Amino acid sequence: MRRVVFNQKGGVGKSSIACNLAAVSAAEGHRTLLIDLDAQGNSTHYLTGLTGDEVPVGIADFFKQTLSSGPFAKKGKVDIYETPFDNLHVVTATAELADLQPKLEAKHKINKLRKLLDELAEDYDRIYLDTPPALNFYTVSAMIAADRCLIPFDCDSFSRQALYGLLREIEEIKEDHNEDLEVEGIVVNQFQPRASLPQQLLDELI
């Protein structure tokens, strides 16, 4: 199972949800990997406690390899970090991801992440993908590589408008790149049961 957690709106609890789901999966005995694709590295910090120069280069190094050429270039390898939790590993993210993005887009490397996950499939039962709060190279790569998409959602009118746009984008990615991708569910955050708007939004989603 490959699950991407994504919303193009920031501050909706995306990294927290991805880390907690991965931790629960590992606690249940599943061999679990979380790949952090967000240059902010929140999931990396949550799961390793590392910051700044302490963080292994991780997924950025993998994408750099895809840009390399020549007979001796290292290809398709990724460093996997063991967390303090049993059965839970992480591929870390660093700020270098932001610098790599335009180069990766120019070289059309959008399917490289899916190939990596195919290679890791024998080693892990569940793979979670934490993404940046933008519809960019990394999030599209993640949705091409995943088979399930989980969307964190804040109960406000702005989030509702963004959600419908996101669902259209996911459907387009499904049609063009990944017919196996399914929206698994919407995780409602900051729900206030006594307020009328959140209840209206929840009824609409249901």
Residues covered by each model-derived region:
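P-loop NTP-binding core
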Residues: 1-206
